[in-house]
Amino acid sequence: MAGVPVFMRRILLTLTIASAFIGMNAPASAETITLVADEWCPYTCKPDSDKPGLFIEIAKKVFAREGIDVTYKTIPWARAIEETRAGKYTSIAGASIGDARDFIFPTEPQAQSVMTFYVKYGSRWTYQNLASLDKISLGTIVDYSYSNLIDSYIAKNKDNMRLVQQVGGNNALESNVLKVIKKRVGATIESAAVMEYYLATQGRTGQLIAAGAMPVNDDQNLYIAFSPKDPNAKRYARIVTDGTRALRQSGKIQEILNRYSLTEEKVSR
């Protein structure tokens, strides 16, 4: 600082010290994870809405305890799995183990799905066993897992449109409902909570009716599952496990369910 007046040296020194102090005390950028799913309300609903979905509200609560921010977007389910598997996103929300067996799962499920068959009102068909499916064409969604038994049936018959018809995209549920109504398929299979929520909110209550369900077992557990490419996946899975247990023990999870007119008995054993 040769040649700089003394008073200017003091100002520059003060500014340097102040800048260093501010830098030392500036908050670090918050850690952020990105969840993706298709629209599968009430589990995963529209982003940025007052009711983004059960899984999104659970995720935000459990990660907030760790100072981690959560962002959420909806894309078709097949893409959600593929791009999260590749490491583009952190996690898929509302997944069963059968959806993506290579992902990192919490040990505590966030909910459960009772996979139920639905037919057009007036239909006499009901699900009895796999043999009963031979009498209809079943509407399903690409890359969904419905239970080990039904997944195997779909894989075996996916190229036989008389038995299995698959749809994808953001409006897959609506597509299957319309196909049942128009008798393009004899039945569709869907989570009871999802189908009942859809029919009620779309003014279609009574147009489709339940016609049997799969036995409730661990095949139907649903999770927030993490990308196998993410180095923090195991840590995130532990956070979700511990956080979900804490929400259940405190009764906070029922407060979330109340917002979607659900009881824990309906989404959990």
Stretch-by-stretch model annotation:
Residues 24-30:
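Sec/Tat signal peptide C-region and signal peptidase I cleavage site
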Residues 59-66, 108-109, 145-169, 177-179, ...:
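Ligand-binding cleft/hinge of the Venus flytrap
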Residues 116-126, 219-234:
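A bilobed periplasmic-binding-protein/Venus flytrap-type ligand-binding module shared by bacterial periplasmic
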